[in-house]
């Protein structure tokens, strides 16, 4: 047990409830969902065996229907929504940076450049911050593309507009970091921002790939962040790296040969995470980890459980980016494990 200057006591190893870490509970969780899938699967098999002509069209794949895929604002409200999008993204970034990242505010009147190593165990955050930059720009590009498409832009134009506005917004963030006492301008952050933008553009341009692949963020607030929240101090989830995992997800529901089987409820995840870099008092060492896992496709589950509507579609969209904590890590590789000096 370690106590800081405020008298707050941290448990150095156990940051999650012990029973949640029991692998058998995760096995039971996955088994229940797969079992529940057999009923709709049997119906699909029955349809195939009937006299109804077989179809290989999109609905026959069993992919969830998201109303936001075709949503558009009215002609009356579209100009206002578009103006709010143009202004809201950079202004929101500026306000967030001033409050959480302490941009200048009279403390630093010069621009600093601080490149941070992103490869190797000695990287300040073990590379988790670069994954965070990539995910934030991936999600931002896709959201802004949706906003422009929903306000009247064509598909290709909306992709370009979304990518450019996201780039402007993220670059404002990097310039602001240059005036921060805690960060500084990092060219590697800009590089990983572009990786995220590129991934978002590719998946927006090719819907067939988007139905199979996505980048997701798993997050469960750390004890330090919960402590800050309870004491009304700053709680920046974007830099709470010891509580985050970043994944490239393969959605089995998007594969035609698997979309009418129980496997459509599952995702295959390849993920990366670090522990002990951001909050060293909570861990005995700094570790970098890669894992291969299986998780539930909550987007498909919501579409099957909830009635069609914007509530269901909102949850489906959310789970395309946010990865709930429940997953089954089949294999975990520790890249490095360095005790704190």
PLM feature segments, named:
Residues 38-130, 134-141, 145-150, 259-261, ...:
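N-terminal targeting leaders of membrane proteins
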Residues 146-152, 201-206, 250-259, 298-304:
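Outer-membrane beta-barrel proteins
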Residues 172-194:
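Interfacial helix-loop-helix junctions of multi-pass membrane proteins
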Residues 198-199, 246-252, 292-298, 337:
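Residues on the lipid-exposed face of transmembrane beta-strands in outer-membrane beta-barrel proteins
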Residues 203-254:
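Primarily interfacial, aromatic-capped hydrophobic alpha-helices that serve as membrane anchors
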Residues 211-215, 264-270, 292:
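Transmembrane beta-strands of outer-membrane beta-barrel proteins
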Residues 219-223, 272-276, 298-300:
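Transmembrane beta-strands of outer-membrane beta-barrel pores
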Residues 240-246, 264, 286-290:
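Residues that define the transmembrane beta-barrel architecture of outer-membrane proteins
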């Amino acid at each position: 047990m370690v106590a800081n200057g405020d008298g707050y006591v941290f448990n150095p190893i156990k940051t999650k409830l012990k029973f949640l870490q029991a692998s058998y509970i995760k096995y039971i969780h996955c088994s229940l969902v797969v079992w529940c899938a057999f009923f709709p699967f049997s119906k699909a098999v029955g349809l195939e065996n009937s006299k109804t002509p077989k179809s290989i069209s999109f609905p026959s794949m069993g992919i969830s229907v998201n109303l936001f895929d075709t949503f558009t604002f009215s002609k009356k409200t579209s100009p206002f929504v578009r103006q709010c999008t143009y202004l809201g993204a950079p202004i929101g970034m500026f306000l967030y940076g001033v409050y959480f990242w302490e941009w200048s505010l009279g403390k630093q009147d010069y621009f600093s450049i601080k490149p941070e190593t992103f490869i190797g165990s000695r990287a300040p955050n073990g590379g988790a911050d670069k994954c965070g930059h990539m995910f934030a720009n991936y999600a931002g590009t896709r959201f802004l593309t949706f906003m422009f498409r929903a306000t009247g832009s064509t598909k290709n134009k909306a992709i370009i507009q979304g990518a450019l506005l996201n780039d402007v917004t993220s670059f404002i963030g990097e310039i602001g970091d240059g005036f921060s006492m805690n960060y500084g301008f990092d060219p590697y952050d800009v590089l990983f921002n572009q990786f995220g933008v590129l991934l978002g553009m590719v998946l927006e341009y090719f819907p067939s790939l988007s139905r199979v692949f996505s980048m997701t963020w798993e997050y469960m607030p750390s004890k330090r962040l919960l402590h800050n929240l309870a004491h009304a101090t700053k709680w920046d989830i974007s830099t709470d790296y010891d509580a985050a995992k970043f994944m490239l997800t393969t959605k089995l529901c998007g594969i035609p040969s698997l979309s009418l089987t129980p496997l459509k409820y599952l995702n295959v995840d390849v993920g990366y995470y670090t522990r002990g870099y951001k909050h060293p008092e909570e861990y005995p060492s700094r570790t970098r980890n890669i894992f291969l896992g299986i998780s539930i496709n909550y987007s498909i589950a919501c579409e099957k459980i909830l009635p069609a509507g914007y509530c269901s579609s909102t949850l489906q969209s959310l789970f395309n980016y946010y990865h709930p904590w429940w997953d089954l890590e089949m294999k975990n590789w520790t890249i490095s494990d360095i005790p704190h000096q």
